[in-house]
């Protein structure tokens, strides 16, 4: 053999079998940035149709977690696939930089503003802290292979962005959507500030569940409403009973609310202390049961409408409150009578406005009752629940109480219960200029993926309250408005003033607002009457208006609007919604054309990531151990529309899949050794049939892969890629061609046909891989022949190219069409089972020791005969003869194909030292005593002729 070794076309490539990604990827990254890969892509795609994926900004605090990695990788895969599809798809990553978490981190270092440091110094410290956090996260994202404008990202704290956020506020005010109101808002007593809907999370909490008596101020007036005849009025005090789980709100009670069409019953409670109580008829039994009242009877009935404006005594204060009517009253639980405190609830506030009720708010920003709060001054509201219960017992107003576990709003930062508290705030009004209806209309024009996203956001927008956009914080974009000191009306020249302030902020940042002398801007006369608003904007406003502050403003987008927003499914109540509402308020249209959502990352058992459980998978650990391409492949392999599971075992499966794809690519590259596309490509019509079939399979795969990319169905991309590499190529084509590729005449037609197919296929394969396994695709690209088929030099990077358009398929009218090769593969699969059995029974060693006789029915025999002597190369045996089924021998074995029996014989022919086939002509040719005639031709002659395989 040694004398013929140099005549073989052994595979050779510098592309290593082992990825060693953790070591190699950083080296590739360095080259990408040294050679400005992102700039090269932008240059290559200049003037093409644009695709804008607008980045939802992560918060600039802490290390990135696996959820960040999932989100950014999905975006990067989609953008790279769009680039390969011929789009100009710039990516400008962003960061959310204002707000409380950063304030809290800075407070730990320098104390609260106004104590050791001034507010101005505090803001500067916040800016420095956020900048450092951005840099840390940026490096982590770059390590994942994410390409973008990393040197020029957008940060909501950039002076120009802060200025544009103020301009957005001005536009919303201009369009009539801004509202100043004294309204109940979500309030965190730990933050000392209002919260947006998106900053509230719900968790279970145990509260006191209480039924409270409100005595009738005029018993006769109440009894008259129930139409009771004289002598049948019953005995004892008359009370209406409310149910609540927030006893601390009772000091602010200003009404009891009923439903107009609901039936209410006046119940006579019997016993030593008789009394008469009013509850909804439907709930009477459950009220009596929980109060432990066994002996009672009904005295009369009335509707809620009958009882409207009847007065009842507050349970512990000296004033009376009216019975009012509201549609929010239900019979799901409670008593059918709702305690109404307009200062502590949105529905209470709304119904209170209809009746002109006082909006009482006895609670300070720290959650403590104000000094003038009778009975409870100085107590924290949650601790005061017990005090309220004691007072109710004293006054004889407590009918029943028990501990009650229920879902309750909590601050997403502090994880502590929040309250509703009426304060003067600025709102984007959903109603006063028809914003809610406009937003609901705009939703219908957006493509939501998955489609349930549409109904989800519709429900949220339809039911949401006014958007409270003001915050009482230090580190935030100011609500740059001037209001009249007495009337609180906006300055009549607000639009011009906002633009002047925005210009100042563009030069000096938000501190310019606090440094601004009102008289300088307004003049002395106006300055005497108007004052600056000192509140800051909700950070959801900051990020929500980036469709204007960033997308409309950045020249990289060339005036294009965002095509896509892609975030986690929690953003229907967060960024998707704040962006939608602000865009409709500013531009009367949605800020996006399509919205794609992904689920949350959980562990292999479906549990949330938790440090206490110890199941956290950090992206940095994965890249340091396995490499970013494994993490990227994991992301693309999942159905990201639901929960996305990750664990060491799941990542190991991704690593295994990666190895199969890498090894397939390596086979292609190793067998292109010595191939020059400019001179060595075989014309399509002259190629061996099986080679054309393989290119056709690549074409079919490419069509499906491109479609899957277009549908953002990334796991379908991975499945098709795996199927192509493992099944169509690995299990069949590559297995069959090894003999021809290694043993055919070097540079001869048989080898060059095979190499032509391999070249075309790897040109396509490397592009399919590029959006997902970006580092490996770049590595493959650099190991490919430097020249392309047309003689031009290969681009420096695969990412600047487009899908390969040089593939071709078999025509269905051809004799050896796709259906033919499908049948051949089935035969091969059946034969392989018999060969495996023969090996197990020690009849043969390898398959080349076998000679086959295939007894086939006429239809199948005719197909097999088309391959002639080349059938043996497809079946990987030294001989394969086709005979009619009628001649079937006793030794022939049945297969799982109807009409096919196969006899496996051990060959008696000599083994060729070069190709290892056993043929009768081994050693029969002078000068070549150990090789077969085919090999002699490949070594010294014209080379063997292959037509089919």
UniProtKB/Swiss-Prot annotation:
It holds the Pfam family Anticodon_1. A motif ('HIGH' region) lies at residues 58-68. Binds 1 zinc ion per subunit. The keyword ATP-binding applies. L-isoleucyl-5'-AMP binds at residue 567. Keywords: Aminoacyl-tRNA synthetase, ATP-binding, Cytoplasm, Ligase, Metal-binding, Nucleotide-binding, Protein biosynthesis, Zinc. The keyword Metal-binding applies. It catalyses: tRNA(Ile) + L-isoleucine + ATP = L-isoleucyl-tRNA(Ile) + AMP + diphosphate. GO terms for cellular component: cytosol. GO terms for molecular function: aminoacyl-tRNA deacylase activity; ATP binding; isoleucine-tRNA ligase activity; tRNA binding; zinc ion binding. ATP binds at residue 611. It is found in: Cytoplasm. GO terms for biological process: isoleucyl-tRNA aminoacylation. Catalyzes the attachment of isoleucine to tRNA(Ile). As IleRS can inadvertently accommodate and process structurally similar amino acids such as valine, to avoid such errors it has two additional distinct tRNA(Ile)-dependent editing activities. One activity is designated as 'pretransfer' editing and involves the hydrolysis of activated Val-AMP. The other activity is designated 'posttransfer' editing and involves deacylation of mischarged Val-tRNA(Ile). Belongs to the class-I aminoacyl-tRNA synthetase family. IleS type 1 subfamily. Monomer. This is Isoleucine--tRNA ligase. It comes from Vibrio cholerae serotype O1 (strain ATCC 39541 / Classical Ogawa 395 / O395).
């Amino acid at each position: 053999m040694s004398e013929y070794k140099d005549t073989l076309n052994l595979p050779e490539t510098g592309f290593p079998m082992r990825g060693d990604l953790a070591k190699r990827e950083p080296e590739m990254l360095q080259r990408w940035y040294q050679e400005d890969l992102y700039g090269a892509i932008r240059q290559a795609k200049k003037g093409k149709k644009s695709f804008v994926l607008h980045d939802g900004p992560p918060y600039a605090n802490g290390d990135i977690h696996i959820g960040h990695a999932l989100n950014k990788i999905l975006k990067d895969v989609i953008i790279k696939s769009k680039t390969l599809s011929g789009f100009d798809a710039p990516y400008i990553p962003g960061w959310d930089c204002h707000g409380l978490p950063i304030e809290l981190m800075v407070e730990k270092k320098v104390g609260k503003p106004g104590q050791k440091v001034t507010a101005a110094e505090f803001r500067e410290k916040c800016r420095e802290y956020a900048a450092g956090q951005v840099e840390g996260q940026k490096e982590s994202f770059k390590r994942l292979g994410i390409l973008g404008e990393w040197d020029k990202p957008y940060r909501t704290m950039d002076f120009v962005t802060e200025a544009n956020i103020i301009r957005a506020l001005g536009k919303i005010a201009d369009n009539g959507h801004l509202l100043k109101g004294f309204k109940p808002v979500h309030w965190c007593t730990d933050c000392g500030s209002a919260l947006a809907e998106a900053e509230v999370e719900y968790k279970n909490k145990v509260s006191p569940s209480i039924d409270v008596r409100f005595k009738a101020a005029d018993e006769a007036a109440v009894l008259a409403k129930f139409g009771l005849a004289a002598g049948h009025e019953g005995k004892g005090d008359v009370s209406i009973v409310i149910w609540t789980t927030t006893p601390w709100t009772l000091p602010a009670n200003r009404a009891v609310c009923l439903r107009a069409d609901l039936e209410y019953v006046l119940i006579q409670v019997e016993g030593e202390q008789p009394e008469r109580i009013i509850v909804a008829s439907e709930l009477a039994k459950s009220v009596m049961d929980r109060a432990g009242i066994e002996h009672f009877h009904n005295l009369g009935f009335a509707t809620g409408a009958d009882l409207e404006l009847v007065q009842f005594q507050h349970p512990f204060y000296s004033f009376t409150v009216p019975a009012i009517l509201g549609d929010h009253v239900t019979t799901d639980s409670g008593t059918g009578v709702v305690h109404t405190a307009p200062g502590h609830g949105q529905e209470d506030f709304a119904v209170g406005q209809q009746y002109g009720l006082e909006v009482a708010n006895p609670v300070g920003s720290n959650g403590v009752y104000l000094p003038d709060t009778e009975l409870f001054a100085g107590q924290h509201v949650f601790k005061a629940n017990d005090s309220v219960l004691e007072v109710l017992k004293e006054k004889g107003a407590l009918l029943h109480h028990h501990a009650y576990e229920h879902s309750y709003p909590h601050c997403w930062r502090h994880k502590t219960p929040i309250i509703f508290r009426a304060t003067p705030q600025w709102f984007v009004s959903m109603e006063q200029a028809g914003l809610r209806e406009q937003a609901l209309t705009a939703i219908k024009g957006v493509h939501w993926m998955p489609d349930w996203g549409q109904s989800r956001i519709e429900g949220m927008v339809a039911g949401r309250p006014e958007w409270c956009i003001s915050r009482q914080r230090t580190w935030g974009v100011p609500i740059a408005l001037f209001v009249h000191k007495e009337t609180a009306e906006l300055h009549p020249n607000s639009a011009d003033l906002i633009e002047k302030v925005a210009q100042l902020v563009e030069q000096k940042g938000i501190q310019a607002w606090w440094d601004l002398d009102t008289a300088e801007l307004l003049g002395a006369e106006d300055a005497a009457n108007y004052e600056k608003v000192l509140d800051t904007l909700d950070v959801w406003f900051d990020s929500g208006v980036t469709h204007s502050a960033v997308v409309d403003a950045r020249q990289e987008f060339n005036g294009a609007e965002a095509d896509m927003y892609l975030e986690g499914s929690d953003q229907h109540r967060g960024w998707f919604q704040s962006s939608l509402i602000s865009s409709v308020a500013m531009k009367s249209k949605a800020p996006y054309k399509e919205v794609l959502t992904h689920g949350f990352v959980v562990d292999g058992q479906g549990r949330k990531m938790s440090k206490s459980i110890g199941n956290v998978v950090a992206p940095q650990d994965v890249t340091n151990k396995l490499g970013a391409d494994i993490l990227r492949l994991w992301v693309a392999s999942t159905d990201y529309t639901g929960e996305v599971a990750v664990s060491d075992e799941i990542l190991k499966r991704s690593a295994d899949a990666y190895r199969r794809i890498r090894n397939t690519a390596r086979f292609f590259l190793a067998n292109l050794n010595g191939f020059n596309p400019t001179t060595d490509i075989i014309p399509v019509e002259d190629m061996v049939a099986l080679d054309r079939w393989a290119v056709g399979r690549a074409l079919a795969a490419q069509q499906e892969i491109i479609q899957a990319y277009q549908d953002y169905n990334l796991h379908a991309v991975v499945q098709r890629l795996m199927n192509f590499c493992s099944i169509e190529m690995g299990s069949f084509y590559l297995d069959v061609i090894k003999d021809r590729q290694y043993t055919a005449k070097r540079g001869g037609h048989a080898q060059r046909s095979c190499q032509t197919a391999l070249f075309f296929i790897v040109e396509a394969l490397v592009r399919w891989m590029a959006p997902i396994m970006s580092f490996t695709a770049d590595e493959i690209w650099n190991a490919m022949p430097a020249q392309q088929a047309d003689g031009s030099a290969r681009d420096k990077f695969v990412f600047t190219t487009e899908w390969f358009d040089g593939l071709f398929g078999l025509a269905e009218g051809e004799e050896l069409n796709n259906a033919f090769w499908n049948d051949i593969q089935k035969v091969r699969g059946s034969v392989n089972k018999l060969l495996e059995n023969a090996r197990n029974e020690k009849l043969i060693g390898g398959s080349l020791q076998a000679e086959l006789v295939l007894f086939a029915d006429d239809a199948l025999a005719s197909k097999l005969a088309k391959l002639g002597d080349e059938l043996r190369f497809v079946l990987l045996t030294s001989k394969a003869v086709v005979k009619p089924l009628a001649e079937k021998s006793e030794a022939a074995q049945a297969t799982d194909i109807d009409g096919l029996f196969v006899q496996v014989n051990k060959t008696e022919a000599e083994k060729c030292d070069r190709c290892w086939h056993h043929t009768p002509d081994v050693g029969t040719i002078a000068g070549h005593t150990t090789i077969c005639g085919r090999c002699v031709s490949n070594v010294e002659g014209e080379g063997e002729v292959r037509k089919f395989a």
